[in-house]
């Protein structure tokens, strides 16, 4: 459940520090409380995230229609929250195991792997191309497929959990 509900809770907490939430202080007042250095580092990281999502082809070109790409700027706050939510939930899960024997694998998957499988299952969806196009243009949330694949690509612990070696498919 840490990979699912834990991530959702961490996601909502992270909104307090995303591209919008970062503009409010501890009392909820709009206030630039970040140092110039912190703001510059945040912008550099979020620019990378925007470019990563902008490069995602959500629908290929067909029948005279151009390909449709994700909109990294539109979905930035949610993508930041997905990144943060995963990290918060992973830390909470590991803290819950402190001083305890690690749970046994289930169906051949380690507890760490099951954490990420729980996350992927949370965002599983089956939608028509027309809805993919509509959501990509209007929704501040990335499509479920990309909430998983594009988010996990930035998390070294995911690669470690599944023993993914550096190679041509390594992101």
Show where each model-derived region lies.
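Zinc-dependent metallohydrolase catalytic domains
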Residues: 1-6, 16-171
């Amino acid at each position: 459940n840490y990979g699912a509900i834990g991530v959702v809770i961490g996601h909502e907490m992270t909104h307090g520090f995303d591209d919008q939430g970062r503009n409010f202080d501890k009392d909820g007042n709009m206030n630039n409380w970040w140092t110039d250095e912190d703001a510059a580092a945040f912008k550099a990281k979020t620019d990378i995230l925007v470019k990563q999502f902008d490069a995602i082809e959500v629908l290929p070109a067909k029948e005279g229609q151009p390909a449709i790409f994700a909109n990294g700027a539109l979905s930035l706050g949610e993508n930041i929250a997905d990144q943060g939510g995963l990290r918060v939930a992973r830390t909470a899960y590991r803290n819950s195991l402190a001083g305890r024997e690690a749970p046994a694998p289930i169906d051949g998957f380690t507890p760490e792997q099951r954490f990420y499988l729980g996350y992927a299952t949370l965002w599983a969806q089956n939608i028509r191309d027309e809805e993919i196009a509509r959501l990509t243009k209007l929704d501040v949330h990335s499509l479920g497929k990309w909430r998983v694949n594009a988010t996990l690509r930035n998390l070294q612990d995911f690669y470690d959990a599944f023993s993914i070696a550096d190679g041509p498919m390594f992101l």
